[in-house]
């Protein structure tokens, strides 16, 4: 056996054996080799499958993560996506091969360890299953699939092959979200009993995405890969059969957070949808959708309201948890997590204590006085029930960097900053698991539960009926 081939097998067997136990076991520093200097054998060779807008976002983030080497790029838009991604990688000294056919890539690239999949939703199951069966670990963007059957096949393939599958619900690796879940909800239960949740993704949708006419994909290739036209290829999210609709495409992240924070899956859903803004000729999915979920939890029943607008961006994106003692609002887009104490139902000295110990932080005036005030004084000064309007979001210059503060002196924030691109911690988690240093934060079974939760909204909207979930439906 030649030296080069032996080194390749040793490196790959090391990474794959580490990942095999990494999903359920975290290596000690000695076992994972962290006490010795990093070697080439620690590098992870990656292929990018889908080099469009989202694929390039993930690619650019991976370029910032040590030990990640791109070896291949695959995309059917050769004159645009493929060339741009491949050239950029070479500029960063990632020598790579470019492919149109993913099967050819998986067959020829024998030195890969993992594949990052950022193709349209209807390709996710096929690309994921093929990559797993080729012996590779997979990071797959959300939505997991445009069908429940496709998501189920992905779970089964991961189990059958023993390879890792991380679904791209990146809030599960976000330090702010983790702090809120672990510390605020599980440890201290600062909100008390949660009775309701609301979330939204409001935006102004782009007009149909165009393309350079000189860079069109030929009709034969489009048809081979499931598209009727370049317009459909460029705007696939709005076509039935190509995506799971707006709640699946965009709501997967937020409904996943709600499932995670409430510790269970929904028991029922009602939904409505309509096309009020976008051109119906080029859009098959609704541009406006609203869903009402019911959850049965240990705390009691919880009502969840979720909306998507495509013509108005007021309020942006957020998840809000309403408890008897307070409200928690998180927003990945605004990079914030704030708590609004409900003083009628809670002890103001408890909230003052949270601030005094640094468990939560207040606005500048409060924090400047913290050292010289007792808990009782903080409570009387800053946590007195008043008839105040709901908080309005503003920027205050003397606040800790990276935190957006409401213009209400009772509103608190978590003492955790998130200074990385939003996808980076989730990708880092995936690569750490391959090296045997962590557990997946969104394994396929969790992604499947989210897929079931969001895809059923479409049926509810189309039929106008309240649909019940059975616990067995969330098991693949």
At which residue positions do the language-model features occur?
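Phosphate/diphosphate-binding loops
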Residues: 306, 310
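N-terminal glycine-/serine-/threonine-rich beta1-alpha1-beta2 phosphate-ribose binding loop
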Residues: 2-140, 152-164
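Short, solvent-exposed loop/turn segments that connect beta-strands within catalytic domains
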Residues: 92-94, 296-302
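Active-site beta-strand termini and strand-to-loop segments that position acidic
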Residues: 293-298, 323
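Short, solvent-exposed turn/loop segments enriched in Gly/Ser/Thr/Pro and often Arg
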Residues: 77, 99, 118-123, 145-146, ...
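Non-transmembrane alpha-helical segments in soluble domains
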Residues: 15, 59, 74, 86, ...
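C-terminal helical cap and adjacent loop that interface with cofactors, partners, or active-site loops
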Residues: 8, 17-22, 57, 249-266, ...
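Predominantly a Rossmann-like dinucleotide-binding segment in NAD(P)-dependent oxidoreductases
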Residues: 50, 54, 160-166, 171-283, ...
